[in-house]
């Protein structure tokens, strides 16, 4: 396989460097707001309750309806990011993440591995097609726009990043694996045979994350399923950040999603200026 990569390398690097003339339409948009950590200071359940109340108020003011989840559909996962010592992935706008479900207080032996090409500018159609063709047959693919609100603490200010990603479930711990091992799963990554032995290790301490669905906002033509992510250090002692988000497919309900997003940004008592989780 590495011999084939060596022959194709110049074309591959050129393909990832140059953007296509036409931009690809995103499969989905994810709206994100960073929640003030003090909202979850007493407990996550109390934080969920406070956010539900805020969502109900915002929905009511916009002529929408909020339906809170009956139970907190909460899942605990260990999150880990990888790169080489010289940040070979980050230099080419890639990130590699693995999530391990927590069972009986311990991370599973295998987790979901996600490779992501992420930029502040839109990706071209040809670039997206190459990304899709270079993924493993069983991987789950998506092209998404991430919209972060309250940039610099100002309501209405937002930052958008575009990402093409593919994930594979039930993968063994990737710590100590190499770029060559990664290329076995994702063959069209833009690395040469000489890079194959570069070792992948965690880029930061692991994170213990609690992910929950807390309800949904409904309006004519669509709905927004509200999700939270609360991140702690690996021991679960220090709260690092919290986030409220929802995803939707671009279409007729775009204006409703934007109106809800703008309304929530007025709650500076609940939401804070911050950064995307992956940039921690």
Where are these regions (language model features)?
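Bacterial N-terminal signal peptides that target proteins for export
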Residues: 1-11
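Bacterial N-terminal signal peptides
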Residues: 10-19
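Phosphate-end processing signature that detects enzymes handling 5′-triphosphorylated RNA
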Residues: 23-280
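Basic/polar N-terminal segments that are highly enriched at the extreme N-terminus
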Residues: 1-2, 20-24
């Amino acid at each position: 396989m590495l011999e084939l990569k060596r022959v194709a390398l110049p074309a591959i690097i050129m393909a990832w460097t140059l953007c296509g003339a036409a931009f690809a339409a995103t499969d989905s948009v994810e709206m994100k707001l960073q929640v003030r950590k003090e909202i979850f200071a007493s407990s996550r359940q109390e934080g969920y309750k406070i956010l539900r109340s805020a969502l109900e108020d915002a929905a009511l003011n916009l002529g929408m309806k909020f339906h809170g989840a009956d139970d907190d559909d909460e899942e605990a996962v260990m999150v880990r990011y990888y790169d080489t010592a010289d940040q070979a992935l980050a230099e080419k706008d890639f990130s590699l993440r693995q999530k391990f479900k927590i069972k009986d207080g311990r991370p599973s032996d295998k987790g979901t591995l996600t490779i992501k090409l992420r930029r502040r500018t839109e990706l071209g159609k040809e670039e997206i097609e190459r990304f899709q063709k270079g993924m493993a047959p069983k991987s789950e693919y998506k092209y998404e726009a991430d919209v972060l609100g309250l940039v610099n603490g100002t309501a209405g200010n937002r930052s958008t990043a575009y990402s093409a990603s593919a994930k594979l479930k039930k993968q063994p711990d990737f710590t100590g694996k190499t770029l060559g091992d990664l290329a076995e799963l994702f063959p069209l990554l833009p690395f040469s045979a000489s890079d194959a032995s570069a070792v992948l290790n965690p880029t930061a301490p692991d994170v213990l994350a609690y992910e929950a669905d807390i309800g949904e906002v409904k309006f004519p033509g669509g709905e927004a399923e509200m999700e939270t992510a609360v991140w702690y250090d690996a021991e679960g002692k220090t709260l690092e950040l919290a986030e409220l988000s929802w995803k939707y497919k671009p279409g007729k309900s775009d204006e409703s999603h934007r109106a809800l997003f703008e309304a929530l940004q007025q709650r500076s008592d609940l939401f804070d200026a911050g950064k995307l989780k992956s940039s921690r």
